Amino acid sequence: MQPEFDVIRALVDARISQNLTQKELAEKTGIHQADISKLENGTRNPSIKLLKRLAEGMDMILKIEFIPKQKI
């Protein structure tokens, strides 16, 4: 469950760092505010395509890393 929590935390932190409400992010991305809420509450799993749209709406890029277990 940790990777899912990390994605949720990163999404919320990024949105807040850009001083955006869920509604404002929804308007910028065309993604319904209810869907953003579900993502942030962990009741919906995002696709990479959806995460990319969210990142672009926050004027950010999406970066995904594979990290060896011993470095965690």
Locations of regions flagged by a protein language model:
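Short basic helix-loop element that most often maps to the first helix and adjoining turn
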Residues: 9-27, 53
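Short loop/turn motifs enriched for small/polar and acidic residues
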Residues: 67-69
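Short amphipathic helical patch at the helix-1/turn junction of helix-turn-helix
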Residues: 4-5, 16-17, 45
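DNA major-groove recognition helix of helix-turn-helix/homeodomain DNA-binding modules
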Residues: 49-64
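Recognition helix of helix-turn-helix/homeodomain-like DNA-binding domains
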Residues: 30-45
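N-terminal flexible/basic segments that precede or flank functional cores
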Residues: 1-10, 71-72
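Residues in the helix-turn-helix
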Residues: 24, 35, 50
